[in-house]
């Protein structure tokens, strides 16, 4: 696998990429962004997760919030909402702590579990970062959704891991090329925070910046 040590992309972009490659390109390479109710609610949920004590002990579980992670193999870096470390005989040592600990990443999301795998891919990428950093194996983690307010366990299967690797590689290829995929309108577009910038009804191959620049040049 290629080592992306000098070319790290935001891990959070993996979720955008899995949901819509054009959305990812608008947010990251083109740095376009718009807030809507969904993104505001999602941001509040993440802030609540990070606002609590960054380090907490509950019996035989150590809870870390806002933990920075990186994978040079995937070329991704980011922040985990919560990583639980459970005391385990086959875990890993942690600085300042006695015994061995098994990492268990938990990601907070608004709404309900989705029909696509975007959330699962982001969580799996976090686990793969932790595995690379701690030299350990993490078989599963959990997604906590805001509406049902309960956890959904995610198994990090070989298939899910391979999708993370493939999408990460494709993200780097598109980023290096500066390419923004053309719009492919779908029912998901109505809730997208970038629908006004993306202009999916035009189904253009050009980037948003190119379109806006051309529109300004053509205006009287």
Where are these regions (language model features)?
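Metal-dependent nuclease catalytic cores that hydrolyze phosphodiester bonds in DNA/RNA
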Residues: 1-105, 205, 214-220
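Short, intrinsically disordered, charge-biased short linear motifs at domain edges
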Residues: 4-7, 170-186
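Alpha-helix initiation and N-capping motif
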Residues: 11, 22-23, 161, 168, ...
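Residues that form generic nucleotide/phosphate-binding pockets
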Residues: 17, 28, 163, 167, ...
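Cysteine-cluster motifs in flexible loop/terminal segments that predominantly coordinate metals
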Residues: 20, 179-220
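Noncatalytic linker/hinge segments flanking ATPase motor cores
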Residues: 55-58, 145-151, 180-187
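Nucleic-acid nuclease catalytic cores
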Residues: 77-78, 84-177, 190-196
């Amino acid at each position: 696998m290629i080592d992306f040590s000098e070319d790290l992309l935001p891990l959070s972009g993996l979720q955008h990429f899995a949901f819509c490659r054009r959305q990812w390109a608008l947010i990251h390479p083109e740095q376009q962004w718009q807030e809507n109710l969904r993104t505001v609610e999602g941001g509040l949920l993440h802030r609540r997760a990070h606002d609590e004590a960054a380090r907490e002990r509950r019996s035989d579980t150590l809870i870390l919030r806002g933990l920075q992670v990186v994978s040079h193999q995937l070329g991704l870096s980011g922040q985990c909402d919560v990583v639980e470390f459970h005391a385990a005989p086959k875990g890993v040592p942690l600085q300042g702590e006695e015994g061995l600990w098994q990492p268990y990443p938990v990601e907070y999301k608004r709404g309900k579990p989705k029909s696509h795998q975007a959330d699962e891919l982001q969580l799996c990428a976090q686990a793969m970062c932790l595995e690379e950093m701690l030299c350990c194996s993490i078989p599963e983690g959990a997604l906590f959704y805001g509406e049902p307010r309960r956890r959904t366990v995610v198994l990090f299967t070989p298939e899910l891991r391979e999708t993370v690797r493939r999408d990460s590689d494709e993200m780097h290829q598109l980023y290096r090329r500066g390419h923004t995929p053309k719009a492919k309108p779908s029912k998901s577009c109505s809730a997208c925070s970038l629908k006004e910038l993306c202009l999916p009804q035009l189904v253009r191959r050009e980037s948003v910046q190119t379109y806006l620049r051309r529109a300004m040049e053509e205006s009287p």
